[in-house]
Amino acid sequence: MSGCRAQNAPGGIPVTPKSSYSGPIVVDPVTRIEGHLRIEVEVENGKVKNAYSSSTLFRGLEIILKGRDPRDAQHFTQRTCGVCTYTHALASTRCVDNAVGVHIPKNATYIRNLVLGAQYLHDHIVHFYHLHALDFVDVTAALKADPAKAAKVASSISPRKTTAADLKAVQDKLKTFVESGQLGPFTNAYFLGGHPAYYLDPETNLIATAHYLEALRLQVKAARAMAVFGAKNPHTQFTVVGGVTCYDALTPQRIAEFEALWKETKAFVDEVYIPDLLVVAAAYKDWTQYGGTDNFITFGEFPKDEYDLNSRFFKPGVVFKRDFKNIKPFDKMQIEEHVRHSWYEGAEARHPWKGQTQPKYTDLHGDDRYSWMKAPRYMGEPMETGPLAQVLIAYSQGHPKVKAVTDAVLAKLGVGPEALFSTLGRTAARGIETAVIAEYVGVMLQEYKDNIAKGDNVICAPWEMPKQAEGVGFVNAPRGGLSHWIRIEDGKIGNFQLVVPSTWTLGPRCDKNKLSPVEASLIGTPVADAKRPVEILRTVHSFDPCIACGVHVIDGHTNEVHKFRIL
């Protein structure tokens, strides 16, 4: 029953419930900001044995950009996504910076990095509370909670004071909402009526629900921090080829405004997000057994020198088959995009600088093609990118901050590093990354202030547009490795390719039929209720594909369509 703990196996790890169902399950659409996602799985005796990930919306930005001024790229590519818009602006700007050969000033690097830090904090808070937590939290079970008991639990896991009155107010508001019969985003949620895959007790559900509401208000602060230097959010307007345009970012007033918003956001991360993550993770330790992948790639992030990836606070690296004793250096020439199973002309794998975007829609699985996404590969292998890749590689490289936070999380949960290769590990890594970046923003901010105090007020460098050039911009966005690739011809965009985190993780098979990370991660996932496959969505959501709208689940035996809302 929802709100009750699952039966525990020896060692205190819950036994994950599963059904005896065999047949297909289709979740369509699983939507996100970049487009729509369709997940199709084959289940045998209650476990997933095969999976297909399909992006069902054509984007076509690469086609739109051809023939335009390279400086305009950032304004178009930001519209790829309404959440992490700045990362695309940064990737496009770095891409053209690289093509024209300009070295940007120190202050510009600091300002770009600070806005990116705020972007990370905003994205990861929103993901945990509003896109992923409700795969684990039963909001309606919070109505059964004792607010006084819940307040004691909250105070035991966080230094923040939480009163019974505060939680009672949330519970009363929730009760009124439920009794109205108009559940809005919770209509037909998986947990309504109870679901065996939800384990949290009522008090923990009440605490999480209260923090869900608080995070709605808090994420505005992180977004505002981005706008302090970025002019607005979403779709910032301060990056230009050669640096930034925001001269007011040099003033004490604007710096103080950013600093105040960062401090408030960091306090929430330290006192709310991380404690909540640890409580949820402790209850769902069985999810350290599912959702893992083998290959990882990160471009690293927060550079001192834009031209040196190894100057980044997080270093780049590549790992195959979980061999973290043998971290490979990143080589941009080893990236290829495969289209054999995508709705594009041809079947040849191409490096992004030679990439083509020529649509060829068949139908679902016609000619074995089933997605508008291409399939990026590194040395021919599918690679997971994102917080888990960045944390695992940084940990293995001996990154002191990452090691300290990761070891503390693992010790608190009583598990070893191997537990990170999982759905739960991916979710925990996002929290670890958030905590490390939240602290590092303060370090960067102080360095920026010190640099200004030395009399440096330069924020942009001059440059000239070449007739012919190639460039690439690498950003480790909140969802992972993002790269923009440009070929300039006669001073205009001759070709432009975006290789985004979601194509790395959520793309289709390649020409060698190797599954993408999300497809591979779903194999072996238990499903307790085929009509409410929350387990599938736990793993899909752990990659952070911004879920927002309605979903249909098709029963393979009856062809009955079950409609419900992703939470």
Curated annotation (Swiss-Prot):
Keywords: Iron, Magnesium, Metal-binding, Nickel, Oxidoreductase, Periplasm. The gene is hydB. The lineage of its organism: Bacteria, Pseudomonadati, Thermodesulfobacteriota, Desulfovibrionia, Desulfovibrionales. Catalyzes the reversible oxidoreduction of molecular hydrogen, in conjunction with a specific electron acceptor, cytochrome c3. GO terms for cellular component: periplasmic space. It comes from the Bacteria. Coiled coil: none annotated. Residues 553-567 form a propeptide. Its EC number is 1.12.2.1. This is Periplasmic [NiFe] hydrogenase large subunit.
